[in-house]
Amino acid sequence: MFIVSRLKDLTIITNRLRHYFRNMDVKELQPPSSVRGMQELQREQFRKIVQVPRLRVPESQVQRVMPLVKKFLLKMEHLHPVRAVDQSREILLHPTPVKNWDSLPTEDLQRQKVNAENFSFADLELRYENWSANEILKSVLPTEEEGLTSYSRIGHIAHLNLRDHLLPYKQLIGQVLRDKLPNCRTVVNKASSIDNTYRNFQLELICGDPDYQVETKENGVPFEFDFSKVYWNPRLSTEHERIVKMLKSDDVLYDVFAGVGPFSIPAAKKRCHVLANDLNPESFRWLQHNAKRNKCLPNIKMSNKDGRQFIVEELREDLLKRLCTTDTTTYGIHITMNLPAMAVEFLDAFRGLYSADELAQLPTNVCYPTVHVYSFAKGENTKELVRQLVESNLGASLDENLLQGINFVRNVAPNKDMYRVSFKLSLNMLTTLKEVEVTRKRYAEEELEVATKVKCV
């Protein structure tokens, strides 16, 4: 149902877009005011009788009349606006645009032998089933504070992150969502912040079955996993798609914090060469499962290690072989680091990853990997803050030749944003330890200070 800007005016309905009048702006079509503050769902309390305009026409005329009144039909959940009554049909109309007979295209209707005698108002019983989840919750939850603004769907699970003032209503919210959302069997609430080793959500079951093994699709790719034991955020699907679209067949992807594979599996399906890693044994198990399910095992190697260990072992070995034995100008090499709470802390693992001798014979036109690291930033100028975080942990400044972009991903909380910082690794980064670079910079600053003092004397 689309929102109409002015309910008091008759609205022109285009053939391309089907706009209907918003029922929640019409008091008569709202749930009873008596349900406000309800904490235990009582579906029978939502019953009410309303009067709505109607046309009653012979059955033989319905097909000719419907195109004339289609834009005025009363649209509600589980309500058929055209109903059989004896040998005729009752067409229920929306009370906002239709106040009386003259609100309708009377001349066109009269040509079909429908006149004012066919128009009247009828009693209509509305029930819990006739309102959407949003309409039910809007009528129940307190008006003085923000209601339920969003939730995530992962397969048959609805995942909430309720604020404190909504916790007394959590059972009701869970029941309403399970009732109203298609194929929803389980409703959970985020019980605490993500602070465990494996960075997965701590969940509280508030309604439905304690079944957390889900099947879902992201950007056309099927995934299966236990939502209670791994990290999965459907709000990142667009970002996953952005990265995968950057990749071409035969490109290389090193996925340091792969999870169950939202970057790695689509990349492997595109016939990229993928090395994927995750510390969580459950994520690793489902990563393997999803690779097998999507028939991309030949294109992906998987490991179950700490991200730093993966960088200094698998990534180091594979990248060295590619840099030394292949033409890196013919394909792209990408490194994804999607662990925004701490991924930047792993950037120093790239510093001094190789000795100068190991990379001494590389051609001058060698193409080094592009790193896509995700991070949270909290404050006023979050874009600048996230750049500083990356440069500080990397121990290097990112000039215009190295920095590929700082891209906003999503707002997480007030003044807290998630970003992707994309940058090129360089020969200097890969062959110089972070501590050496910092010492060199400090020494240069001290030399400059001494020189300045000498000039002043």
UniProtKB/Swiss-Prot annotation:
Keywords: Cytoplasm, Methyltransferase, Mitochondrion, Nucleus, S-adenosyl-L-methionine, Transferase, tRNA processing. It catalyses: guanosine(37) in tRNA + S-adenosyl-L-methionine = N(1)-methylguanosine(37) in tRNA + S-adenosyl-L-homocysteine + H(+). It is found in: Mitochondrion matrix; Nucleus; Cytoplasm. InterPro entries: MeTrfase_TRM5/TYW2, SAM-dependent_MTases_sf, TRM5-TYW2-like_MTfase, TRM5/TYW2-like_N, tRNA_Gua_MeTrfase_euk. One of its GO terms (cellular component) is cytoplasm. The keyword Glycoprotein does not apply. One of its GO terms (molecular function) is tRNA (guanine(37)-N1)-methyltransferase activity. Gene3D superfamilies: Met-10+ protein-like domains, Vaccinia Virus protein VP39. Pfam families: TRM5-TYW2_MTfase, TYW2_N_2. Its EC number is 2.1.1.228. It comes from the Eukaryota. Monomer. Belongs to the class I-like SAM-binding methyltransferase superfamily. TRM5/TYW2 family. PANTHER family: TRNA (GUANINE(37)-N1)-METHYLTRANSFERASE (PTHR23245:SF36), TRNA METHYLTRANSFERASE (PTHR23245). This is tRNA (guanine(37)-N(1))-methyltransferase.
